[in-house]
Amino acid sequence: MTMKKSNILGIFVGLFIGLVTVLGMSLFIFINLKFNSVYYAQHIPHKEGTDPDVIMLMENMGWAYTPEIEGISYDDDGSYSITREKGTKTSVLDLTGDTLFFHSESNDRYLLNRNFSVQHAFDKRYHTIKYNQRKVQKEIRETVQPVIDAQPKPLINLQWLFNLALSQQMVDFDEK
């Protein structure tokens, strides 16, 4: 009888250790993918004109590395935004839900969808203005590039898993 009890106890201990190991590995993978999402997004195949690294930075700003950089400030209370001050000029990129808001150095304002297509463009008096899509994307890139450049390389690189997990999401960005 004691042999059966010890076998059953051994099975339960083995299952418990296995469960804890799987949960620990899952937690590590989740944290790794979130914390390094900007780095991974820089290296994921994507259609030209889409900026998955900028999207990952804005979506995961609470997880991603946001170093102290002169002229850059972060706001993550309610929405995620990055402000860049360059001399007397200021630009702000903000993500709320699925909408990006960009306030350019020239005081123009743009509402963009997640694949960086401008939906609306306004001047400082909120009159509709004409815009150049590439110029707006370039200005957005200039606003956040110092933060993207500061992202560390992961200690354990799970690029393949990031690509697998987000490849469909990136395809969806490209098609919208």
Feature locations, PLM:
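N-terminal Sec-pathway targeting helices
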Residues: 1-24
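N-terminal export/targeting and maturation segments
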Residues: 22-105
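N-terminal first transmembrane alpha-helix
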Residues: 4, 10, 34-36, 40, ...
